[in-house]
């Protein structure tokens, strides 16, 4: 199986199905990623340990700090105590909350996590006085997309007058 085909099936599996954790599985939150496909997680009871990412998810699914996972316990591990079995997206979290499988300790964290992802990052620009006629329609750029990853340079009237005089 080629890498592209494998990626397609893994992504389809993660995004498509809604899974319910079994008795042995746990829902955990990612705290940090120390590397080597290991992730430090915290359970709803506050217990911290390392989990490993199976090879089918490596280079196909990316896990960030604050994401939620379903993990299977590993009995022979000292430091690594579980393996990731499913990565939960916000739709999965909502369905687990509706079905009553979501831990109460993660309820507030999940709400904050969803709100931060949905929040718009565009800063509001100060409103400029409206001009009449054609000038206002040609110079009104407030409905255009603003790239927040770039610096915004503002020209003062003095600079523009100096450029026109030269």
UniProtKB/Swiss-Prot annotation:
The keyword ATP-binding does not apply. It is found in: Nucleus. Residues 5-89 form the S1-like domain. Its main location: nucleus. A motif (Nuclear localization signal) lies at residues 6-12, 56-65. GO terms for cellular component: cytosol; nucleoplasm. Keywords: Nucleus, Phosphoprotein, RNA-binding. Residues 114-166 are annotated as: Disordered. The modification Phosphothreonine is found at residue 33. It comes from the Eukaryota. Interacts with GAPDH and STAT1. Plays a role into cellular response to oxidative stress. Decreases cell proliferation. This is Probable RNA-binding protein EIF1AD. It comes from Pongo abelii (Sumatran orangutan).
């Amino acid at each position: 199986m080629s890498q592209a085909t494998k990626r397609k099936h893994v992504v389809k599996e993660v995004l498509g199905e809604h899974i319910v954790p079994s008795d042995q599985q746990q829902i955990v939150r990612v705290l940090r990623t120390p590397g080597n496909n290991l992730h430090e997680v915290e359970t709803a009871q506050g217990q911290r340990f390392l989990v490993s990412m199976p090879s089918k998810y490596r280079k196909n699914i990316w896990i960030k700090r604050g994401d939620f996972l379903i993990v299977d316990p590993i009995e022979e591990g000292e430091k690594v105590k579980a393996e990731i079995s499913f990565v939960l997206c916000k739709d999965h979290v909502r369905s687990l909350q509706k079905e009553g499988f979501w831990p109460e300790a993660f309820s507030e964290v999940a709400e904050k996590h969803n709100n931060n992802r949905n929040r718009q990052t565009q800063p509001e620009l100060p409103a400029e006085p409206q001009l009449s006629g054609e000038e206002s329609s040609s110079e009104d750029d407030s409905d255009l997309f603003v790239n927040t990853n770039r610096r915004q340079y503002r020209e003062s009237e003095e600079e523009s007058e100096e450029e026109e005089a030269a």
